[in-house]
Amino acid sequence: MSSPLSQAFAQNFLGHSPRWYKLTVLAFLLLNPLLLWLAGPVTSAWVLVGEFIFTLAMALKCYPLQPGGLLVLEALLLGLATPEALYAELQHNFPVLLLLMFMVAGIYFMKDLLLLLFSRLLLGVRSKTLLSLLFCLLAALLSAFLDALTVTAVVISVAVAFFAVYHRVASGQRASEDYDPATDRQVPELHRAHLEEFRAFLRSLLMHAAVGTALGGVCTLVGEPQNLLIGHEAGWHFVEFFRQVAPVSMPVLAAGLLTCVLLEKSRRFGYGAQLPAAVRQVLAEYAASESRKRGAQQKAALLVQALAALVLIVGLALHVAEVGLIGLLVIVLITAFTGVTDEHQIGRAFQEALPFTALLVVFFAVVAVIHQQHLFTPIIQAVLALPAERQPGMLFIANGLLSAISDNVFVATIYITEVKQALDAGHMSREHFDTLAVAINTGTNLPSVATPNGQAAFLFLLTSSIAPLVRLSYGRMVWMALPYTLVMGGLGWWAVSHWL
């Protein structure tokens, strides 16, 4: 019989993850040294990449930082990569780490302004089709200049706040009472139909907004973390990045917005739910109450946030400094002029992005393994051996398929580095490199909406507090994203193959 201490170790290992998942990760850790001894470093490295992708695909079972971190720690100990190679990767991609550390935190301090904007939109527009289009378009516009993760966080905050307000009223609970919005036990039968319709309404808006972040995020240097990686390798600043990607991103944006309208009109794939009149009345009363509470100090803070947003956009457009440093500027401006000087208040802004920043370091460790073992060199050589006109389309497909099951930052890092090495070795012209860089950028951004694993914003939505409240499961997200995946992936491939 096992001792209480050994049982405690077993329970503590990877926390609340399922037992089968814990055993799988342990099996990986035991298999890798044996495989290195029997099959050599290249085979072991390929298996490690597959194991790491598995941890990304199982992100709902356990955040990938812990199992992925254990795998790369073992890889470093086994000599599949060196700590120096990992450090070199981190130095090379330091602008991306700056982006995640400071830009996401900077936008956190604009949340009040963004919450007000989305709240006014939700209650001010009565046509569900128009509302969905505006949510998608606004998310796209914001994601082009801000961080897609933060835009998604704002939309989630609006949805959680409004759901909690109506759920409390439907449950008959007073505002002063503690209650759990995750359970419907106290909701009478009379209100349940409205509650389910409201859930479907919020689900569709959340998905439209999440897709909007992908539509806008692909367009600019700061829209997604991998864009900055690609732009850094290609030497593109903000305006140049937009110009290079526009032949693909602009038609796909238009097609995505049209898809949004058609889905709401057809009421297919889980879209088309309306906001019940009774729910609208409750939410309108809540919004009016919040507006009455807003004093001169709060209004001044909103004005500061709006001015900081303007500084942010101008700073990005003119590339006055690295993106992350502009984010730090936003933090300083907003906190200084809104009176946020408490260390703990400021610290909350960094909670959202730092786990993902740590995970990105683990990504780069896997990339270091790939580089040191030359795993992707044969694949890139096979693509480059194709006729030049077929290479962008094939890279788009290769990136898209892998991005749908893995994280697109990870995929983009691998491919853009390999293609840059081919350019440096004189295997292609600069013009052709630019075309392939666009193919990699769009290939990792557009088809990756197929599953929550591909887009960080989608994964954030799925693992957020709103997902269980509105019954947004992994399978439902895949189903609701399917029409967008087909349109964005199909048109993106055509544009990359024929319009670049």
Swiss-Prot record:
Task: Kindly list the residue ranges recorded as spanning the membrane.
Answer: 28-50, 68-88, 98-118, 121-141, 145-165, 205-225, 244-264, 311-331, 350-370, 394-414, 449-469, 477-497
Keyword Ribosomal protein carried by entry:
no
List GO molecular-function terms, semicolon-separated. sodium:proton antiporter activity
- Give the record's free-text account of how this protein's activity is regulated: Inhibited by amiloride.
* Keyword Transmembrane attributed: yes
Q: Which GO terms describe its cellular component?
A: plasma membrane
Topology of the protein relative to the lipid bilayer = Multi-pass membrane protein
Which UniProt keywords are present, listed alphabetically? Antiport, Cell inner membrane, Cell membrane, Ion transport, Membrane, Sodium, Sodium transport, Transmembrane, Transmembrane helix, Transport
Reactions accelerated catalytically: 2 Na(+)(in) + 3 H(+)(out) = 2 Na(+)(out) + 3 H(+)(in)
Q: Which domain of life is it from?
A: Bacteria
List the NCBIfam families.
PRK09547.1 (NF007093)
What protein family is recorded? Belongs to the NhaB Na(+)/H(+) (TC 2.A.34) antiporter family.
Q: What does this protein do?
A: Na(+)/H(+) antiporter that extrudes sodium in exchange for external protons. Can also transport lithium.
Name-wise, this protein is Na(+)/H(+) antiporter NhaB
Q: Organism source for this protein?
A: Pseudomonas aeruginosa (strain ATCC 15692 / DSM 22644 / CIP 104116 / JCM 14847 / LMG 12228 / 1C / PRS 101 / PAO1)
